[in-house]
Amino acid sequence: MHSTVHSFRTPEGVTLGVEHFGDAAAPLVLLAGGTTMLSWPDALCETLARGGRHVVRYDLRDSGASTTVDPAAPAYTLRDLAADAAALARGLDDRPAHLAGIGVGGMVAQVAALDHPDTFSALTSPGRGPSHRAQSTTTCPTTTRRR
């Protein structure tokens, strides 16, 4: 299956390295966990695309083909990374996207889904943090409904 690689520039000026698989219908945005987008295997992306998804994987800030931030610049947060994901998803289609993240990408995906509920239709977040035994430092609703 053919994929396309390009750059996406967020409204804040961050450039994200992005790869697309499949048609433009039914977007699925994949967030990697602490490494490059290549942690989502090509075979998985291709299989999902053959199933009718527009699979989009990308490098978070400071990884792979995305913007590398100057260490002297102000720090960024999970909320900034979540805003990057939302900007990318909004740039794909008028319809909400399914969002999936692993590791750090899972934490970013959760914040993105909470901060930008109209941008995402679903969230898949296996392995969302460093330890399943870690205590939560935030309180999240057990369910979120669209209005």
Q: What is each residue range found by the language model?
A:
Residues 7-68, 74:
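Conserved HGGG/HGGXW glycine-rich cap/lid loop of the alpha/beta-hydrolase fold
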Residues 79-97:
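Conserved acidic catalytic loop of the alpha/beta-hydrolase fold
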Residues 95-138:
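Conserved hydrolase catalytic core segment
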Residues 1-7:
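An N-terminal hydrophobic leader/cap segment in hydrolases
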Residues 136-147:
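Helical cap/lid subdomains and adjacent loops of hydrolase enzymes that gate the active-site channel
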Residues 45, 86, 114-117:
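A structural alpha-helix within SAM-dependent methyltransferase catalytic domains
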